[in-house]
Amino acid sequence: MKVRLLRQLSAAAKAKAPSGLQGPPQAHHFVSLLLEEYAALCQAARSISTFLGTLENEHLKKFQVTWELHNKHLFENLVFSEPLLQSNLPALVSQIRLGTTTHDTCTEDMYSTLLQRYQRSEEELRKVAEEWLECQKRIDAYVDEQMTMKTKQRMLTEDWEIFKQRRLIEEQLTNKKVVTGENNFTDTRRHMLSSRLSMPDCPNCNYRRRCACDDCSLSHILTCGIMDTPVTDDIHIHQLPLQVDSAPDYLSEMRPPSVSSASSGSGSSSPITIQQHPRLILTDNGSAPTFCSDDEDVAPLSAKFADIYPLTNYDDTNVVANMNGIHSELNGGGENMALKDESPQVSSTSRSSSEADDEDADGESSGEPPGAPKQEEAIGNGNPKTEESNVNTPPPSYPAQQAEQTPNTCECHVCKQEASGLPASAMTAGALPPGHQFLSPEKPTHPALHLYPHIHGHVPLHTVPHLPRPLIHPTLYPAPPFTHSKALPPAPVQSHTNKPQAFNASLQDHIYPSCFGNTPDWNSSKFISLWESEMMNDKNWNPGTFLPDTISGNDILGPVLSETRPEALPPPPSNEAPAVSDIKEKKNAAKKKCLYNFQDAFMEANEVAMANTVAMATSSATSSVSCTATTVQSSSSQFKVSSRRPPSIGDVFHGLNKEDHRHSAPAAPRNSPTGLAPLPALSPSALSPASTPHLPNLAAPSFPKTATTAPGFVDTRKSFCPTPVAPPPSTTDGSISAPPSVCSDPDCEGHRCENGVYDPQQDDGDESADEDSCSEHSSSTSTSTNQKEGKYCDCCYCEFFGHGGPPAAPTSRNYAEMREKLRLRLTKRKEEQPKKMEQISEREGVVDHRRVEDLLQFINSSEAKPVSSSRAAKRARHKQRKLEEKARLEAEARAREHLHHQEEQKQREEEEDEEEEDEEQHFKEEFQRLQELQKLRAAKKKKKDRPSKDCSKLDMLARNFQAATESISNSENIHNGSLEQTEEPETSSHSPSRHMNHSEPRPGPGANGDATDPVDPRDPSKLLLPKEVNGKQHEPLAFLLDMMHHHKEGNSKQKLKQTSKTSNEPARKPTEPPKTTEVQLKPRAQPELKPKVVDLALLTEQKREERKTNSNNNNKKQLSHIKEEKLSTVTPEPPSPSQLLQNGRLILASSPQPKGKNKKNKKKKGDRTSSSLDDVFLPKDIDLDSVDMDETEREVEYFKRFCLDSARQNRQRLSINWSNFSLKKATFAAH
C-alpha cells in the first residue's frame, strides 16, 4: 500500500513539474487513492476481526485495543506519517482546494467532497494516534509486568531451596514445644500462613502487595517478625530475657530472608524492608535517601509502631540511656549490647528492634566494627530518641547492617552480582548517615530489586549490595517465639538506639543464633575455622589488620563507623581505623562483650572483613553468608544460611581471640544484648556488677567513651568479659531463654575471659563442644527441643546429605558447626585434590615413559586378562567338555543298545530258522504220513482214540512240567498260575474249543497275552519281563505250541505255507502267556525267576522233543483234527476280557498255594531282584513301524513299552505322593 502510494506520489510529482495545470487532478487522484487505501484497510480489518474474537476479547481487550484500531494505527504510523507523504500532503491539499475554486460545479463538488473526506480521515488518524499512545502505555506496562514476573519466577526458582529449608524450619518450629513465647510465635505464624491474603495489614510493614504464595508468606513472616505477636508496652524488660532468647532467633530468622536472598533473590530471603522494619532504620537513617521512598516510610513506621516494637521505649530511663549509649558506643553494636543487656529479649522482642539488630548485625557483618555503630549511637545516644532523629544515631544495628551490607551483599542474584564489585566509595558511604550508609548513594537501587518488595522492601536495601540480607535459616527459629520481641517492645523502640539494640539481639541471633543462647556448642574456634578456611584462610584475625589491610574493608568500616559515629568518625574510610579503635574502646566499655555479641563480632569481623573484604567478597560470593561478621562474604553464606551466623561471627571473633588475641576472649553472657550476660532485667539497675562489666554503662555515652578508650577490639575482648554474667535465671534453657543473639553457651569462648586472657583449655573445651555438635542448646530449628528423643535429624543438611538415620548421639542443630565442618571438609578435599592430581600426573608420566613394546606386551600378556574372563572361559570349556562327554556317553549307549538289539534279533532269527527247519521237516514227515493215513481210511476210529490219547499225554506232560517248575520254585502257587498259563497254550492247541472262546478255565495264547491285564494293575512295574528271558522261555513254548498246531495242520502242502505263517504268529502270541507267567513270577518270586527261566527252557525243550516224538507217532491220529487246528491257528480270537479275567482267576484259584504266601514271596523276592530284572524286561529300542517283524512280536513290544511307561508313571507318582505326604506331616507337626 505504502509503495503504491509513494509510487503514485512520485509519478504525480514528476507530472507536476512540467504542467502545473495537472496539479488538482493529480492531487485529487492521489488523495482519493490514499483514502481508498485507508478505507479498504479498515474494511478488511473489520472483516477479519470477526474471526479474531478470541484475540480481541481475551488479549487485546486488556489494552483497549481492537483489530481495526491496530490496523488504523499501522496505517497512520507507517503510511500517513511517512515523511515523504507528509511533506507533499499540504501541497496536494492546496491543489484540491484550488480545484474547489473552479467554476465547474461538478468539479467543485468532487474536490470539495474529497477535501472533506480527507479532513475527516486526517482527524480520525490523529485520534487513532492519540488513542494508540494510551494503548501503548498499557501494553508497555503489561510487558514490563510480564518481564518482572518472569524475572521473579527465575529468582524464585533460585530460591526454591531456601523456601524448602524455611518451610522445614517452620514445620519444626510448629511442632516444637517451648516457652509461651514459642507458642505465641507458632500461633502467630500459623495465623499468618492461614490468612495470607490479609497479610497486607501486617503491622510491621507497609507493603500491601505481597505475594500470597506460601513461600513469600513465610518469607514475610520471617522478615517482618509476624511470627512474634506484637508485644504490648506493658511488657517489661525483665520479661525480656526469656523472650529474647527465642525472639532473637526469630528475628534473626526474619533477617534470614535477606540471607536466603543471597542464595536466590527470592522475596522470602530478601532483606527486611525498611517499611517492614522501620525500626531497623533509624528515624534519621530511615529517611536516608538511600532507602528511597522506604526511607520516608521508615521513620513513620518506627514512630507508628513504636508502641508495638518500642526499640527505645524502655520503662527504665537508665536502661534506655544505657542502651542508647551502648548503641552509640557500639555504633549500633553498643545499642545491640545495651538492648541485649537490658533484655536480650528486647532486641529480639521487638520485631523492629530485632530487625534493626539484624540490620545492625548485618552492618557489622558488613565489616563495620560493632564499635563503629556504638560510636555512632554514642553520638546520638545522648537521647535514645535523639538517635532516632540523629543520623548518627541510626540503630547501630542498622548502620552496622549497612556496613555489613557493604561486605555482605544481599545474597539475591542482583545484589550478589554487584557485591563483589562494591566500590570503596560505597564503603565510604558509611560516612553518610547510618541510615544511608548501607544504602550506598552511589549504588542506585537495582531495577530488579522491586521484584521482591516483600523481601527487599519498598526501600531497595539492595542499593547497598553489601547489606547482607538476614538469612532465614532453620537456626533462626531456635529461640522461643517472638515473645522476646514482644518483651523487647517495652524497650524504647522509638529510639533508634534501641533499634540498633534490637538489631543487635536479632542480628546476633541471626549470626549467632546457636552461639547466642541457642548454640552453646558453637565455638569461636569453629567460627575461626570457618572464617579462616572459607573467608580468611588467614589465622591472624587482628581486626586492626583487617581494617587497614582491606581498602574495601576500611571503606565498609569507615562508613559504618562514620554512620554510627559521624562525629567521632569522619565519613572517609580513613576513619575506619580510628573507628575500629573506638569500637575496641567501646568494647572495653562494654567490658568483655561476648564474642558472640553480634556487634562486637562484627566490629572484629568487620575489621577482619575490612582487611579481607576484597578476598571475602570473592569468598562471600561462594559462601552465601550475609552474616554481619561474615559480611566479609567469605563464609557469610554459611552464617546466613543458618541462624548461627551470629555464632559464626562470634566464633570469628573468638577465633580472632584465639588466633591473634588469646589474651582477649569476650565472655559476655549470651543473654546480654551484645552477648554480655543477659540480665533478668535489662535495666542498668538490674545489671549485677558482673553484668555491669559486660555493659559497663547501659547508657550510650559510657560506651562511646569506653570504646574510644579501648586500644583494640582484642583488648576490649580481653577485658570484655572478665566476669561472665550467667544468663538470667528466667532463662530455663540457654537456647530458649537467651535471645538467639545472646550467647547462652557457658562454654562460649566469648564468655571465657580470664582477666582478658583467653583460656586455651576453655578453647579446647569449646572445640570439643563444637566437635560434639549434638547439643540441646545448639541453636536449631528442629521440631524437637530435646535432641535426646532419639529422633533422626531432620535438619536441611542431614536431609540433603542423606543422614536420615537415627543418630548414635543426640543430633546437633548447630548449623554453623555443620557448615564449618562441611567447609573444612571441602577445603581438605580441595587441598588433597592437588596432591592426587600430582600423583596421577606422576603415574601418567611413568606410564607415558614406558616403551611401546612394553605396553603392547602388557596389553597382550595373559596376566592382563581379567580374572572374570578367564573364569568364564574356564567354565565354558568345562561346560563344553561336559556336553561332549555327555554326547559321547549317549552315543556309546546308543551303540551298545543297537548292538544288543542286533544280537537279540540275530538270536531270534537263528532260533526261528531252526524252528522253521524243524517244523518243515516235521511237516514233510507228517505230510507223508497223512498221505499214508488217507489211504488207510479204516483207521479213522483209531485216529479218534489217538487224539484223545495224545491229549491225555499232553496233559500229563503239562502236569509234569508244572510239577517240575513248582519244584524248582518255592512258591508253587506262582508256578501253578504261570505254568498253567504257559502250558495251556500247548494243551489248548489240541482243543480248538479253547481258541473258539469256549468257557474253559484255560486261556488261549491270545487270551493269555491279554490275561496279563488283570495282573498289570496289581504290579505294573513288575509286568515287564526281561527280553532275554522272554525269548528263552516264550520261544521254546511257542515252538512247542507251533509244533502242535503244525502237526494238526499238516493235511496238505498248501497248508505248509500257512502253517509256517501261523507258526510264526503262534510263536509270537504264545510269548504273551509266558510273559504273563513271568509277570506273575516276578512279583511273587523274582529271585527265582532266573533259575525258573532256565528250568522252563529246559522243560520246554524236553517237552518239545517229547511232543515231536508223540506227534510223529500219532500223526495218523491227529489228521482228523488238522482242520480244526487250522481254523484255531489261522483265526485265533482273543477271549473277551471277562473270560480273560475268569481264566486268570481260575488259574490262580486252581493253584493249591494260598495267595497271601505268594504275595509275601513276591514282595520279598521282588525287592531283591527287581533292579537286575528290569534291564531284562525292557522293550527293544527299535522303530516297530519301520522294522519288519511279526505281528505277535510287535504286539509284545508294544505291551512291553506300555508296561514300561505305566511303570515309570506309577513309580514317579508313588514316590512323589509319598514324599509330599511325609512333608505335609512334617509341616503340620511344625505348625
UniProtKB/Swiss-Prot annotation:
Keywords, sorted A to Z: Coiled coil, Phosphoprotein
Ranges of Low complexity composition bias in the record: 258-270, 676-691, 776-785
Stretch list, region Disordered: 249-272, 331-405, 633-703, 719-789, 826-845, 860-1174
Ranges annotated as biased composition (Acidic residues): 355-365, 761-773, 910-920
Biased composition range(s): Basic residues: 872-881, 937-946, 1156-1166
Biased composition (Basic and acidic residues): 882-909, 921-935
Phosphoserine, modified sites: 293, 648, 1136, 1151
Residue pairs linked by disulfide bridges in the UniProt entry: none
Coiled coil location: 106-142, 877-973
UniProt-listed Pfam families: FAM193_C
Polar residues composition-biased segments: 962-979
Family label: Belongs to the FAM193 family.
Annotated protein name in UniProt: Protein FAM193A
